[in-house]
């Protein structure tokens, strides 16, 4: 299936989902890619530690502004990528129409992506590497 509109979701939309969003945008500039948070920290920039992770690989996340997940974003998406099984379950229960197009970013590895929020830079670095690997795993499916 060819996806045209991808939505990446985490909790606050300041750490994991923006990193995945910007990696996907770099790999697929022809697609529409957004991110949002279940409990979005609306109006916040990406976490400085997440921005540093992306800067190290040549990606500027400074334009990112966090937003809260809503039904309209979910309806527009052909593919919804979440960070954990709990997030997938929450979305599918709250918005049943999202079932069948909501998957974990770590689906192909059977992994959840741990939340680095309020952890040290080393934890962010590990999370960033896992996100990069998981984004690469989606390549043959997007």
UniProtKB/Swiss-Prot annotation:
Enzyme class: hydrolase
Biological process, per Gene Ontology: polysaccharide biosynthetic process
GO molecular function, one term: protein tyrosine phosphatase activity
Enzyme Commission number(s) of this protein: 3.1.3.48
Regulation (activators, inhibitors): Inhibited by ammonium molybdate, sodium orthovanadate, N-ethylmaleimide and iodoacetic acid.
Family affiliation: Belongs to the low molecular weight phosphotyrosine protein phosphatase family.
UniProt catalytic activity: O-phospho-L-tyrosyl-[protein] + H2O = L-tyrosyl-[protein] + phosphate
Full protein name: Low molecular weight protein-tyrosine-phosphatase Ptp
Keyword terms, alphabetized: Exopolysaccharide synthesis, Hydrolase, Protein phosphatase
Function: Dephosphorylates ptk. May be involved in the production and the transport of exopolysaccharides.
Known pathway: Glycan metabolism; exopolysaccharide biosynthesis
SMART domains, alphabetized: LMWPc
Location of the active site: 10, 16, 115
Domain of life assignment: Bacteria
UniProt xrefs under CDD domains: LMWPTP
